[in-house]
Amino acid sequence: MDRKISIAATALKAAAVFMLTAIIFVAIIFSLPTPEGFPILEYHQVTNEAVDLDFERYNVPPDEFAAQLDYLQANGYTTITLQDFMRAVHGKGSLPPKPIVLTFDDGYKDNYTTMLPILEAHKMTAVVYVITNELGKKNYMTHDELKDMQRRGIEIGSHTADHLPLTSLTTDEQLYQITASKRFLEWSGLATIYSLSYPNGEVTTEAIEFLRQENYLTAVTGDAGLNTLETNPYKLYRVNIRKPRFGLTEFKFRLFKAEFFAKLRNIF
């Protein structure tokens, strides 16, 4: 009995030490100055009804999305595209004081029917990444909708041909996914495609080399953080915006998450 009590006491002490260490560590992170850089937000659907229950957690209802844009405007953020970012990288332009990039993965039809009108009402822009082999299918945009979206100032990017994690593919398969999607979009009448979103945010060294070969200029990951003009343009940080359970409070937390991980990288 005494041995069990001793083991329990030791476990409690270890847990207390761990909690205290964690609290001190987080306090140190909070005390650090805000790092330079801008966030890239990762959205998927903007609708009252997600494609299916599996995707519900990635859906932001229209009223919540509008409230998030209101918050960004009220706090001085200006949306930019990743082409704007690269122009600044090459000294051909400058970024506004508080830039932010809104990205939308997959190419859902509600991006055109619901998201775009809300975005335009706020005089904002975005980058939309499409899975080319899904275009025209149920719940996805058509070619004409995609072209109209680009004509209205939205940057269009590739989310590969089939949305297969590149880390699970052979070198030749990665090359196909990266090149086929870009060429298909450009051959179908869209302006040059310069950006790619890695499926599931997973990056490979081979993919980065293929992106360079195919004249992509940027690519976004699933890793949270902030981006600067010195950030590797093929490994840009993004923070995922999920269906909010706590309204703007959760959205603010997501913005802070990008800052928090940027602070961590500055330490390590």
Regions found by a protein language model. Name each.
Residues 139-146, 173-177:
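Charged helix-capping and loop-helix junction motifs
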Residues 112-132:
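A short alpha/beta connector and helix-capping loop motif
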Residues 129, 159, 219-221:
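Short beta-strand and adjacent tight-turn residues that come in two discontinuous sequence segments
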Residues 157-172:
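Substrate-binding clefts and substrate-entry loops adjacent to catalytic sites
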Residues 116-123, 141-158:
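Acidic (Asp/Glu)-rich catalytic clusters
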Residues 132-136, 165, 199-202:
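Short histidine/acidic/glycine/proline-rich micro-motifs that form metal-
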Residues 102-103, 156:
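Residue-level marker for buried hydrophobic side chains located in beta-strands
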Residues 2-13, 18-102, 108-110, 168-268:
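C-terminal active-site subregion of NodB/CE4 polysaccharide deacetylases
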